[in-house]
């Protein structure tokens, strides 16, 4: 009994304890909730979980202020009673708990809390001010999600999308109208009931399984529109509205929503060139299985990804049915929430990265459109709400009613989609909707016209604007100049000059021999292989006059490849230079060395008059082929005439043109360098192979070249100042590099030219390329017409702006491929259905992916296949993979891909193993022997084998062995995984490298070979430490032509030995072999001795004598402070560029010399000028300007004082270092800025020989006519920096006045910015900090717009500093005020134009007040320290009176523009764009 009682008592006690603990936990939770909501627990009415959508939207709003927070502005009708309206809203608020909801975080869970509250009404009489203040409120957890304000004329309801949707707005406003009329609000299901019904654990599991299955087949998902960078966050700031009517008679069984979504899928597919599209859509959620769900007030909507298969081969009916089925199937699974979907796996994460949100709303009939609350409220800003509401790059809202009215409201980020492009997208969407509605269901998707009628009209307009020119056949064009300008120079070569009449005479004699002795005529191809000379040009012209066609061969190509091409053209005669004759020994047919000696014995000139067909072959050029062998392109006289008629004027070619023959003869660019120059009546300038492969700048100068065509890779090694008379630079063969554009765009006429060999060299030209041009823009067609089609189906014409394959049409198309009808038919197509014509129209499929820009020009995006450009020449990856696979037949696979490192493009080869061939414990040699030939066991063996069958530029430079082949979800080779591995190597990948044991050590006595080894490895783009001191073949490094040219130039300057690049292409040439050729000239291959132009040689030698004399006369040793800053780095650069400066000692704040030097190199690398060749002329002394004796070592201090025993004395000091701190007082800066100057002058006073001291000043400057006393008085209230620089400068000035031994200079720069060319501004500089602050404030001080802003780029200031430092004479101290600059108004105009922002002008005082107010809330932000300094410094000015000699050099404004552009691109200068609404 007692046990029973005891047991009962214990149970009761336990239950009571549990209840107490539960109540305690509940109280704690309620207390936490109340704290987050800043209220009391008694005010909490209900708590329940958020939907995934609510949680996602709320999270986005926390990271993107303003997102998903809408301000609904209503105009009150005149009779509306304000008090009664407020009471009506109070009733509705109590009726619908969702309007009293807030969101809090309990652990990791987002919960919605319903409070017992009434709305807090604010006044919005000043509507604009209220909206601005309301919009600035930052959303936080526990904060109200709805706010209200009212005035006599307006009511504002601000609401977060987590508490309402479009249906809810209508229901709420209807209830407000009912309550205003004292009616009874009908009962509605609560949002809590919706959550309980829809979000169950069982459904969650089913939903996750559904989405995993739905995305399992995905390979990769592309987004539309594409973002400019992965870190870019879209900000929709523009709206486009459009309305039109369509005939509605759609397919039965398909909803209008289905048609709209299917149409958008086609739009997106057309712009991405993808058959798998993904975009987001917002579903109402009102189709779920719940009674009266259409009456729920709350956000029942759901955002989900839409995945559509847009294969062009399927029927329209099948596509529409599949689209409708997609939406039907996902109804039970629509509420998963994007944030939850992302977490499932890689595929589901990818489909959530969409940037287009497509929303369809059924259109309302006229009766449905009548508002039950319109007599009370009228919405005023609905469109603007939608524009700023979402965070996607594009939100496309569409309504389509049975009446045929289609309405579109698109909100978009205009930095990603322009307004004109947005219009085109809407027109295209409307056009596709119309076709889907009216089409026969059996029609294929490929038959749906994706381009709108408006786009077709625009293409025709662009075509009509093209200029047309006279077309002359090459021989006719050249003959015109022979007849009218016989004495004009046709060829200016290193070995002679030929006038047009002389060229014709020699060519006629050669043609006579070819016709009579070799039976040359139409369609007979003559290979021509020369080291560059005048006789090569004669040979080309001679073949043409004989009626034949020519094939230019590059002597450096592998012998196997040369012989293959000769065999392909069935050559019976080959024309060569004497130096190339040996390469063709044993080749069937006549080998003729064309030179002066031959013409001495062949004087007969008689060619029979014949009518020759215009479509006969003019020349052949071989390009890389995917089958392992090159393919020959046949260009006819007529096709080249059509091309030349357009590209010669586009390139600016005329009778005054002097064009350098620079391209490889194997590159079709060489054709227009030669034939184009002659056809326009210009001059072909022919350098020696040695000069062409060395430094080309002297060649350009000596030959007065005014037009040259280069790849960006090569142009990067030229400087404008080295070729001052060069007028036009055409960049060809590879994408235009941005850094090259910055250097050249404003220095001459810069051109971006594009054209496949199959279309006669040049097809499009962008002229001129400016600093603002898109480097990927290849211009407009110069011959024929361009079209953009679907990459997988040329029967589908794409709209303007869509990415697709470029098709070229016109008379300039080549005949086709030699002996390959199948490839010709695949590449040259006739009459796609969108190009109807009585006669078939012919098009060439380039394989290049492009899109039309808004002005009709073409923007290059890449390749649709594996073809790439290496050093300007086209390379089929498949051809390399073919030869690699033949070398390793036992491999599970082989692949080649492109790897970009800095400015270099490399080919990387991959070999894949299987379980049998891979063993991680084996050496690479063991694995290679299992995969292929036992004789190929090292990386160098592989390269040597490949170079026997392919040109040097096609041989990969890196090699990897993989344990297995990486595959995508679709089972294909995953090339992305290959590229990722290149930067992050795993244990299942072996990187091949030359092993040190494979190559012998170079004898320590062979100094030349060791020096070459060091130089060559320095040039290699990747570290090869295992080859240090080893004797290896040069070919294994995969050096490109520019690197080989550098070696040739080095050998010439270091050892005086002449060498050609062709020599270095020898596969077996080793380091010691190259050294032997230098030290023993007789070991070098014999070259034809060129004739010597004594006049030019004398000029060259005298220039060299003058340069050396000046250098010997002034051997300088300079001590420089502040070398790591923007200006200091530029000073150091110019010192090292001066041959008279033997050594520069840089004083750097660092713990040791190595770290100090690293800082110097880092600054110089950032400024894009550092070269390892400078290292031996720079010495780093670590120290601290603020310490006694500058913190130097005793011996270093003695050297600075000139009292050390050893070493050449220091001859100049440039004191550029200083401490710049915005708010530091004088005493804090004195040690660095003043005491360091005392130390340096103390050291200099001990020099026994005259020297120079230059002080770089700063801070406030004395106004013209201002006496010293008043200036010093004004400085008493200035900042510490200005005070310290003044004291230091005055100290220098007085030191100069008390001695006469040394030359003392003071340079006073204004604001120093980055150069126009490199545009590397110092973001810590006061000027840019001020601009940044003004942009964020939204205003700038504009008082005195005509005042002067002294600003110059670092290069200009450094030049002035060195000029005064090394001046031979002049007063001491000399003072150089760098007063070049621009007006204050012009400066701010440049800021506004370059950033695209509208900034408000203010007076100085008003701006200071605005800045003070703004900075008050930003005191912890470093950005506003300069602003605070300005506010606190009464002497700080926004500009000065324009000096008498103040004037901007031509590049100041350009430099400012360039700096601003860099600051915008890096995000340092950012804006907040306003919403712009555009309506039809």
Curated annotation (Swiss-Prot):
Compositional bias of kind Low complexity: 1-17
Signal peptide interval: none
Region span, Adenylation: 479-871
Keyword Nucleotide-binding assigned: no
O-(pantetheine 4'-phosphoryl)serine: modified positions: 1041
Thioesterase (TE) domain, as annotated region: 1117-1436
Enzyme Commission number(s) of this protein: 6.3.2.-
Keyword match Ligase: yes
GO MF: ligase activity
Effect of deleting the gene: Eliminates the production of fellutamides.
A UniProt-annotated Pfam family: Condensation
Domain notes: NRP synthetases are composed of discrete domains (adenylation (A), thiolation (T) or peptidyl carrier protein (PCP) and condensation (C) domains) which when grouped together are referred to as a single module. Each module is responsible for the recognition (via the A domain) and incorporation of a single amino acid into the growing peptide product. Thus, an NRP synthetase is generally composed of one or more modules and can terminate in a thioesterase domain (TE) that releases the newly synthesized peptide from the enzyme.
Function as written in the Swiss-Prot or TrEMBL entry: Nonribosomal peptide synthetase; part of the inp gene cluster that mediates the biosynthesis of fellutamide B, a mycotoxin that acts as a proteasome inhibitor. In the first step of fellutabmide B biosynthesis, inpC activates 3-hydroxydodecanoic acid to generate 3-hydroxydodecanoyl-AMP that is then loaded onto the T0 domain of inpB. The 3-hydroxydodecanoyl-S-phosphopantetheinyl-T0 is sequentially extended with L-Asn and L-Gln by the two CAT modules of inpB. The linear lipodipeptide from inpB is then transferred onto inpA for the addition of the third amino acid, L-Leu.
Name of this chain's protein: Nonribosomal peptide synthetase inpA
């Amino acid at each position: 009994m007692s046990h029973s009682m005891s047991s009962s008592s214990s149970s009761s006690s336990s239950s009571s304890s549990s209840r107490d603990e539960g109540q305690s936990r509940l109280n704690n939770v309620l207390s936490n909730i109340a704290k987050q909501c800043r209220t009391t627990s008694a005010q909490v009415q209900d708590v329940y979980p958020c939907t995934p959508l609510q949680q996602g939207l709320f999270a986005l709003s926390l990271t993107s202020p303003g997102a998903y927070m809408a301000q609904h502005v209503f105009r009150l009708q005149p009779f509306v009673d304000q008090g009664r309206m407020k009471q009506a809203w109070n009733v509705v608020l109590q009726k619908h708990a969702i309007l009293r909801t807030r969101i809090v975080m309990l652990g990791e869970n987002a919960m919605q809390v319903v409070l017992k509250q009434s709305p807090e009404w604010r006044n919005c009489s000043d509507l604009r001010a209220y909206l601005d203040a309301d919009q600035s409120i930052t959303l936080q957890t526990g904060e109200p999600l709805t706010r209200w304000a009212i005035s006599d004329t307006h009511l504002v309801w601000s609401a977060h999308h987590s508490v309402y949707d479009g249906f809810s707005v209508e229901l709420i406003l209807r209830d407000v109208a009912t309550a205003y009329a004292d009616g009874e609000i009908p009962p509605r299901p609560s949002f809590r009931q919706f959550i309980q019904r829809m979000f169950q654990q069982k459904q969650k599991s089913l939903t996750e399984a559904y989405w995993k299955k739905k995305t399992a087949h995905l390979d990769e998902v592309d987004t539309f529109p594409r973002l400019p960078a992965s870190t870019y966050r879209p900000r929709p700031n523009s709206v486009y509205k459009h309305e039109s009517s369509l005939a509605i008679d759609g397919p039965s069984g398909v909803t209008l929503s289905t048609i709209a979504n299917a149409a958008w899928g086609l739009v997106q597919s057309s712009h991405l060139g993808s058959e798998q599209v993904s975009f987001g859509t917002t579903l109402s959620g009102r189709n779920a299985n719940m009674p009266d769900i259409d009456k729920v007030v709350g956000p029942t909507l759901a955002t989900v990804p839409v995945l559509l298969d847009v294969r062009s081969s399927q029927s329209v009916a099948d596509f529409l049915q599949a689209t409708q089925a997609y939406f039907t199937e996902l109804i039970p699974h629509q509420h998963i929430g994007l944030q939850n979907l992302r977490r499932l796996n890689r595929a589901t994460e990818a489909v959530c990265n969409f940037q287009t949100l497509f929303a369809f709303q059924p259109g309302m009939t006229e009766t449905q459109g009548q508002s039950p609350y319109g007599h009370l409220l009228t919405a005023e800003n609905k469109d603007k709400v939608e524009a700023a509401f979402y965070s996607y790059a594009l939100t496309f809202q569409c309504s389509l009613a049975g009446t045929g009215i289609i309405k579109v409201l698109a909100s978009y980020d205009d930095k990603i989609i322009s307004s004109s492009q947005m219009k085109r997208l809407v027109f295209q969407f409307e056009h596709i909707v119309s076709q889907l509605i009216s089409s026969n269901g059996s029609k294929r998707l490929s038959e749906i016209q994706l381009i709108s009628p408006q786009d077709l009209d625009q293409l025709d307009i662009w075509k009509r604007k093209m200029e047309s020119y006279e077309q002359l056949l090459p021989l006719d064009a050249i003959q015109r100049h022979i007849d009218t300008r016989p004495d004009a120079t046709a060829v200016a070569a290193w070995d002679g000059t030929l006038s047009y009449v002389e060229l014709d005479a020699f060519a006629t004699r050669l043609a006579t021999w070819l016709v009579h002795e070799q039976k040359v005529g139409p369609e007979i191809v003559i290979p021509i292989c020369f080291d560059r000379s005048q006789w090569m040009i004669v040979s080309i012209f001679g073949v043409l006059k004989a009626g034949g066609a020519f094939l230019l061969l590059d002597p450096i190509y592998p012998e196997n490849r040369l012989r293959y091409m000769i065999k392909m053209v069935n050559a019976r005669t080959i024309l060569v230079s004497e130096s190339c004759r040996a390469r063709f020994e044993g080749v069937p047919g006549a080998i003729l060395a064309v030179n002066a000696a031959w013409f001495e014995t062949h004087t007969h000139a008689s060619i029979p008059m014949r009518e020759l067909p215009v479509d006969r072959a003019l020349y052949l050029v071989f390009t890389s082929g995917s089958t392992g062998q090159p393919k020959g392109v046949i260009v006819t006289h007529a096709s080249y005439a059509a091309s030349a008629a357009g590209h010669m004027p586009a390139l600016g070619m005329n009778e005054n043109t002097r064009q350098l023959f620079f391209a490889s003869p194997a590159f079709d660019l060489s054709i227009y360098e030669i034939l184009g120059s002659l056809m326009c009546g210009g001059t072909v300038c022919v350098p020696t192979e040695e000069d062409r492969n060395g430094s080309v700048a002297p060649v350009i100068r000596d030959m007065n070249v005014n037009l040259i065509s280069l790849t960006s890779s090569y142009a990067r090694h030229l400087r404008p100042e080295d070729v001052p008379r060069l007028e036009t630079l055409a960049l060809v063969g590879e994408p235009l590099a941005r850094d090259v554009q910055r250097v050249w765009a404003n220095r001459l006429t810069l051109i971006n030219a594009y054209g496949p060999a199959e279309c006669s060299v040049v097809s499009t030209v962008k002229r001129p390329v400016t600093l603002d041009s898109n480097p990927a823009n290849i211009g407009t067609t110069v011959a024929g017409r361009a079209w953009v089609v679907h990459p997988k189906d040329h029967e589908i014409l794409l709209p303007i702006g869509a990415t697709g394959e470029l098709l070229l049409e016109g008379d300039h198309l080549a005949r086709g491929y030699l002996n390959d009808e199948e490839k010709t038919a695949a590449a040259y197509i006739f009459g796609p259905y969108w190009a109807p014509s009585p006669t078939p129209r012919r098009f060439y499929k380039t394989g290049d992916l492009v899109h039309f820009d808004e002005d009709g020009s073409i923007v290059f995006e890449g390749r649709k296949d594996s073809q790439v450009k290496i050093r300007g020449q086209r390379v089929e990856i498949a051809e390399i993979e073919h030869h690699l696979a033949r070398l390793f037949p036992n491999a599970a696979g082989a692949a080649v891909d492109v790897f970009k490192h800095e400015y270099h493009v490399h080919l990387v080869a991959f070999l894949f193993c299987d379980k049998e061939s891979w063993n991680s414990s084996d050496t690479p040699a063991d694995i290679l022997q299992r995969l292929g030939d036992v004789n190929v066991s090292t990386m160098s063996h592989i390269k040597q084998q490949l170079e026997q069958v392919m040109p040097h530029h096609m041989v990969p430079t890196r090699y990897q062995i993989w344990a297995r082949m990486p595959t995508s979800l679709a089972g294909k080779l995953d090339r992305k995984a290959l590229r990722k591995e290149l930067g992050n190597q795993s244990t299942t990948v072996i990187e091949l490298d030359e092993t040190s044991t494979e190559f012998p050590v170079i004898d320590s006595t062979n100094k030349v070979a060791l020096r070459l080894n060091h130089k060559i490895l320095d040039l290699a783009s990747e570290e090869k430490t295992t080859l240090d001191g080893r004797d290896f073949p040069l070919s294994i490094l995969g050096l490109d032509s520019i690197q080989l040219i550098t070696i040739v130039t080095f050998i010439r300057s270091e050892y005086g030995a002449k060498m050609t690049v062709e020599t270095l292409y020898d596969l077996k040439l080793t380091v010691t072999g190259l050294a032997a050729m230098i030290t023993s000239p007789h070991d070098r291959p014999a070259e034809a001795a060129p004739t010597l132009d004594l006049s030019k040689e004398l000029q060259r030698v005298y220039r060299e004598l003058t340069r050396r004399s000046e250098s010997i006369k002034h051997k300088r040793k300079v001590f420089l402070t502040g070398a790591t800053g923007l200006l200091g780095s530029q000073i150091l650069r110019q010192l090292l560029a001066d041959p008279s400066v033997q050594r520069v000692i840089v004083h750097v704040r660092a713990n040791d010399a190595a770290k100090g030097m690293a800082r110097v190199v880092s600054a110089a690398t950032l400024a894009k000028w550092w070269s390892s060749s400078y290292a031996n002329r720079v010495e780093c002394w670590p120290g601290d300007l603020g310490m006694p004796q500058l913190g130097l070592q005793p011996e270093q201090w003695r050297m600075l004082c000139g009292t050390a025993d050893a070493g050449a004395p220091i001859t100049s000091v440039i004191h550029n270092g200083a401490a710049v701190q915005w708010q530091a007082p004088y005493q804090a800066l004195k040690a660095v800025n003043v005491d360091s100057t005392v130390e340096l002058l103390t050291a200099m006073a001990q020099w026994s020989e005259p020297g120079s001291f230059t002080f770089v000043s700063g801070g406030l400057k004395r106004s013209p006519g201002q006496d010293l006393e008043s200036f010093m008085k004004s400085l008493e209230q200035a900042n510490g920096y200005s005070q310290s620089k003044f004291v230091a400068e005055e100290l220098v000035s007085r030191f100069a006045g008390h001695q006469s031994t040394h030359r003392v200079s003071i340079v006073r720069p204004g604001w120093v910015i980055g150069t126009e060319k490199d545009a590397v501004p110092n973001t810590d500089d006061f000027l840019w900090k001020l601009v940044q602050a003004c942009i964020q404030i939204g205003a700038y001080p504009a008082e005195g717009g005509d005042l002067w802003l002294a600003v110059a780029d670092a290069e200009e200031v450094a030049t002035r500093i060195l000029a005064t430092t090394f001046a031979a004479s002049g007063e001491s101290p000399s003072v150089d005020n760098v007063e070049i600059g621009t007006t204050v108004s012009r400066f701010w105009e440049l800021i506004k134009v370059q950033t695209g922002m509208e900034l408000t002008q203010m007076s100085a005082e008003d701006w200071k007040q605005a800045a003070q107010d703004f900075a008050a809330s930003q005191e912890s932000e470093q950005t506003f320290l300069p602003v605070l300094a300005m506010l606190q410094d009464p002497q700080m000015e926004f500009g000065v009176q324009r000096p008498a000699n103040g004037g901007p050099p031509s590049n100041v404004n350009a430099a400012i523009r360039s700096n601003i552009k860099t600051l915008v691109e890096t995000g340092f200068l950012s804006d907040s764009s306003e919403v712009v609404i555009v309506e039809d």
